[in-house]
């Protein structure tokens, strides 16, 4: 059927058999229509033309809520998308909802929950909500649009009571791996309730801002759970063209979900379960979403920082980080620390460490291997580690007879070694290179005795690794004595598995007893590394070393597309091994990339980005593409949050000290300069690992390593409350702070209640 022809017939009054007159308080519109069209398009007209007295009439007058909107609805029956109005979006929704309801037609009520109404239209919004009824979502709309100067005494006593109760409800939500702990009336008591328990392999990633939905991930599938409804957003079959999931992120207001695949980014609006953007991207190392989910920032393989509008996909700004003079040591490793926990090393001998230096000065790889035997029977031997003469005596160091003299009972802490003594790096033609970047790998070799070393600190020279990101042809994996090799052998008694932490760019290396169920290294790391898992026999076969050294066998050099190096330190609470750095290649471009878990991005506002690299904070002007300010901290920054109001940032360093920076901006929102307002020395009180702002920027919520939740009042500079979680064995994934808490509004609600109670005592 050609609807355009039907529309022309109706406009020219050809073959029409009924006249409909639409009337409202101020408009009257006459339409000449075809009965069969309106009968088949709407249940209202079906009943009107068959069951009522109007069925015999050729002219019908309808008193409708809005004649202009109904006119557009009827022409939609003819396949025409007509807008005969100039209403703002919020008013069009309200008026069209009334008209659809008049005709008994369904409409999407969820759009109501996102309405933004102008102050002069708030009374009209209240009349509409009064018409459809009050529920939690409707009251949320009232909160979101309530003018600052509105007289709350206009509300009923019941509505004010419900608003006050709802405003304090669900103030803080603690997200663990399989449950949501809701802290009701956080300021007044310590009421705990548990909701959305999940007894399945799925892990809760975060909870939407209105607490009605949760997003889960089971390693392959991402779902949105709402009541008894489960909506699948991504699985292996639906995104086969996008590759595997590399990273999952979300906006700070918890309403927008960002899924990074190997070749694509998908952006979902969690509140309406809708895919709002999808675009292909190059290899991405890091990404972050703005507070409201409108902008995305990511860094590609060439260290270009790209800021993009999510809905329009317009690139707002593109900045090459390496071209900014202030970021000269973007890929520095000033200090690498290996900490081991004696309880975790009960099966791993560790009185012999192997230190390997590797460099990529040209198309070949040269290995310089130095072994350091730590005879823990004699503490004086530790001082001899700094003697460079010992490095050349490899025969003595590798003498297995010397190892039998060690004493199992000795326990020494904080073993230190300075790597500056190991600077001899040669290419295949024995030419010594200047300023060649190096990276270090520490491995534990098998031996007969176990000694307990709690930490090994390696102080490396500060070197820029950006120059070392050059193509390579092969990597002699027979020289890599890494526990990761055990992944190819599922029968090993002590296996290691690498798994991604979806809440941060840090990967975890944890020791498991028994089999790893044949899980591939490529699957575990979520990177393209099929050659390692599929050709593990070839990689670990020392007989193939001759082939690797033979340049004529270049066809076989694809066995090692990735160089993976690990420096691990333990989380003594959760007994996890933290993967500090990994270096791998992009298969297409064969370029090295250094992933740094201490590299973070966040939006301060739409004009300014926060970029953190290890100990340094960079404030970047998005528009002018320049560094506004550079702040160097004493320690690496492990977590940070920007205030939703854009007036401060909070960071947690590696010593669990929280710093709060006050941000000074001009009238247009451009950052002038940041100042350290104060720091919270909380190490002796608790160990904060997660941090979250309230929506008004006044309060900070800290996670005390899964033991308790602490609330800090920024204005009063004091802890205001502490909530014991009693969940020592649970890992907190996320903290959600109520979107709307504001002391001033609470006072306004209470005052309005008192005024009504005084006016109507009974």
UniProtKB/Swiss-Prot annotation:
UniProtKB keywords: Coiled coil
Segments of this protein annotated with the region Disordered: 390-411, 532-556
Biased composition (Low complexity): 532-543
Residue stretches in coiled coil: 737-762
Domain of life where this protein originates: Viruses
Biased composition (Acidic residues): 390-410
InterPro entries cross-referenced by the UniProt entry: BTB/POZ_dom, Quinoprotein_ADH-like_sf, SKP1/BTB/POZ_sf
Domain BTB, residue spans: 16-86
Family affiliation: Belongs to the mimivirus BTB/WD family.
Protein's recorded name: Putative BTB/POZ domain-containing protein L272
